[in-house]
């Protein structure tokens, strides 16, 4: 959850900043949005640009956001085991050794991020290391390594780029129509202000609606990461890890969405979750 939400929030922020900059350029220079084809090209440049900038920033931002400490030289047996386990799994999965970090949190959390399969990050919480058995923790690590091996951050970026493109295109197309109707009654300055306000408002609204698509895709990829972990360490270890997370959720019924997809609510809430419900993931693994 942490990996996906950080990417989506950063992506939205970058796209909005780029959008504001473009609107200021329009206002200062008097340029108009132009033809539909020109608008689509601009939307694609900004949409994919925002997504890929977010991806390139993801590793450093993720570390800073949790106050993670990179393990360069293991200081104890736990850190030694952690590095050794990730190294072994990375070799099995055919990827470069990820940067490994630990961050202080009582929650059972872990995430992976990074722009490249050979330049990635795997971070685990102290809560995970303290509350899981070695077999369970090994399965969680295998799940994160599988995300990297599957190239999930890159495919999510491409998906987000497409979504961004349509969000920007539709927002500005509608804003242009509204501003054009307004220009018959008001001055040019008012026309640009209307265009600016409507385009930003619609980007926020359409961006929220588009998150249903990106969250669906994220849930889809979680099943693949679970299957990848099952291939690396065996499905029983992966099931045990999910069962442990389920027990943790049941002991803390506060509705918190953890990094491994724990949430007590279903229905509409599930559509906005980056991870499928644990019961569905466990059932899928039992049939694997």
From Swiss-Prot:
Cofactor(s) needed, names only, are: Zn(2+)
Lineage top rank: taxon: Bacteria
User: Which residue windows are transmembrane per the record?
Assistant: 4-24, 36-56, 151-171, 193-213
Read off the InterPro entries from this record.
HtpX_protease, Pept_M48_protease_HtpX, Peptidase_M48
Which Pfam families does the UniProt record give? Peptidase_M48
Report the top EC class in one word.
Answer: hydrolase
Record family assignment = Belongs to the peptidase M48B family.
Q: Tell me which species this is from.
A: Vibrio vulnificus (strain YJ016)
Q: Which residues form the active site?
A: 144
Q: Which UniProt keywords apply?
A: Cell inner membrane, Cell membrane, Hydrolase, Membrane, Metal-binding, Metalloprotease, Protease, Transmembrane, Transmembrane helix, Zinc
What is its subcellular localisation?
Cell inner membrane
| Organism taxonomic ancestry | Bacteria, Pseudomonadati, Pseudomonadota, Gammaproteobacteria, Vibrionales
GO CC terms on record?
plasma membrane
Q: Cross-referenced NCBIfam families, in alphabetical order?
A: PRK05457.1
How is this protein named in the record? Protease HtpX
Cofactor binding mode and count:
Binds 1 zinc ion per subunit.
Q: Which GO terms describe its molecular function?
A: metalloendopeptidase activity; zinc ion binding
State where Zn(2+) binds. Answer: 143, 147, 222
